[in-house]
Amino acid sequence: MTQPTIEDTLLRLAAVIDSRKGGDPEQSYVSRLFHKGDDAVLKKIGEEATEVVLAAKDVRQGGAPSALVGEVADLWFHCLVALSHFDLSPADVIAELERREGMSGIEEKALRKRREREENGG
């Protein structure tokens, strides 16, 4: 039996998250976030990102790496919720990462700035 890929896992989890749209906010945490709207979804990402930073600092001070893994999992989960909330999917992010693959960060940033100038008529 073959191991599922990271992409398979993300897409499967995204499908579960998508299925919570319009669900009962009393029965599902994700449905509750969707029901509360943009601010609630985005606030959770900020909270989880802060927890990732704190857990990473703890690892540097001898803390458990598993705590960092758990916090990153929470952040990824809430990012998947945000993607779904804005009618996007992990496939959109994966496509963007694949587009950037093999390109230096400096080169990618310069291309992005040039594209933004062109879109803004400058």
Swiss-Prot record:
Q: What is its EC number?
A: 3.6.1.31
State the Gene Ontology BP annotations. Answer: L-histidine biosynthetic process
Keyword annotations from UniProtKB, A to Z: Amino-acid biosynthesis, ATP-binding, Cytoplasm, Histidine biosynthesis, Hydrolase, Nucleotide-binding
Which pathway does UniProt place it in? Amino-acid biosynthesis; L-histidine biosynthesis; L-histidine from 5-phospho-alpha-D-ribose 1-diphosphate: step 2/9
Catalyses: 1-(5-phospho-beta-D-ribosyl)-ATP + H2O = 1-(5-phospho-beta-D-ribosyl)-5'-AMP + diphosphate + H(+)
Instruction: Indicate whether Iron-sulfur appears among the record's keywords.
Output: no
Q: Has the keyword Cell membrane been applied to this entry?
A: no
Q: Where in the cell is it found?
A: Cytoplasm
User: What Gene3D superfamilies does the annotation carry?
Assistant: MazG-like
Q: Which GO terms describe its cellular component?
A: cytoplasm
The GO terms this record gives for MF are: ATP binding; phosphoribosyl-ATP diphosphatase activity
PANTHER family, sorted:
HISTIDINE BIOSYNTHESIS BIFUNCTIONAL PROTEIN (PTHR42945), HISTIDINE BIOSYNTHESIS BIFUNCTIONAL PROTEIN HISIE (PTHR42945:SF9)
Per the record, the similarity remark reads:
Belongs to the PRA-PH family.
HAMAP family associated with the record: HisE
What is the name attached to this protein's record? Answer: Phosphoribosyl-ATP pyrophosphatase
Q: Which organism is it from?
A: Burkholderia thailandensis (strain ATCC 700388 / DSM 13276 / CCUG 48851 / CIP 106301 / E264)
Upper lineage is:
Bacteria, Pseudomonadati, Pseudomonadota, Betaproteobacteria, Burkholderiales
Q: Which gene encodes it?
A: hisE
